[in-house]
């Protein structure tokens, strides 16, 4: 049984870990987000069944003592499932089977955060990708991916749920090939799209004295609709900030 260092957050991180545990896979260490950034963190910790000395925080993964600990644990593969911390090269060199990331985007489109937003705003392909981690952000060789259809009624939230589901399914369907080393490894093209967190803030403010193409404005509003998270907004002349969320429904004939 291969030795797995598991790095996970969010519902996908929980569901993939549950699936691995149900199959009696060998999780030798767990890395979670710090408490203020955790989603499903306590459930992930409980599911791992690991004692506290084998559970680590994402903020320490590139520290020397953590790297020394990983060399002792000897993981053969590192799995990053909706995990938001960047790995140093020294850590990536430890597992013989490499470091894998599950990303809710159809790479090379949607590199970086909020791929659900940018598939709508940029009108680029959406999907799920399982890929190797390299020194770039979501730029490593692709193992496998699947597309997800973006409907005009989708919001940032509904598309995220679809991408989340596709990611979990993609991992389950391909884990055996990864363990056996029979998976494909395809270099990513240099094209595609990449966005930062700051890019989202640039589209969030809708200026009342500017003209927008209707299609673009609708796309921004629906892409940023994901309650209770912040959405697109307007600033009124009296200084009030008003958030805008939309609901789209197909007409019934």
Question: Which residues does each PLM region occupy?
Answer:
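One-carbon transfer enzymes
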Residues: 1-253
């Amino acid at each position: 049984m291969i030795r797995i260092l598991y790095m996970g957050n969010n519902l996908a991180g929980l569901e993939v870990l549950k699936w691995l545990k149900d199959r009696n896979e060998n999780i030798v260490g767990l890395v979670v987000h710090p408490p203020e950034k955790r989603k499903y963190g306590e459930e992930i910790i409980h599911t791992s069944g690991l004692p506290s000395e084998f559970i680590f925080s994402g903020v320490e993964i590139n520290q020397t003592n953590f790297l020394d600990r990983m060399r002792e644990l000897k993981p053969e593969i590192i799995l990053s499932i909706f995990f938001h911390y960047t790995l140093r090269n020294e850590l990536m060199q430890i597992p013989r089977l490499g470091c894998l990331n599950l990303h809710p985007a159809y790479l090379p489109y949607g590199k970086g955060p909020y791929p659900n937003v940018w598939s709508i705003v940029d009108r680029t392909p959406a999907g799920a990708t399982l890929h190797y981690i390299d020194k770039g952000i979501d730029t490593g060789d692709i193992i496998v991916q699947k597309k997800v259809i973006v409907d005009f009624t989708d919001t940032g939230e509904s598309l995220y749920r679809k991408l989340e589901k596709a990611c979990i399914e993609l991992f389950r369907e391909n884990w055996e090939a990864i363990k056996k080393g029979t998976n494909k490894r395809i270099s990513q093209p240099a094209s595609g799209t990449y966005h930062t967190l700051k890019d989202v803030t640039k589209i969030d403010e809708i200026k009342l004295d500017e003209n927008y193409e209707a299609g673009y404005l609708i796309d921004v509003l629906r892409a940023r609709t994901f309650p209770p998270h912040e959405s697109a907004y307007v600033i009124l002349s009296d200084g009030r900030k008003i958030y805008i969320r939309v609901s789209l429904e197909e007409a019934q004939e």
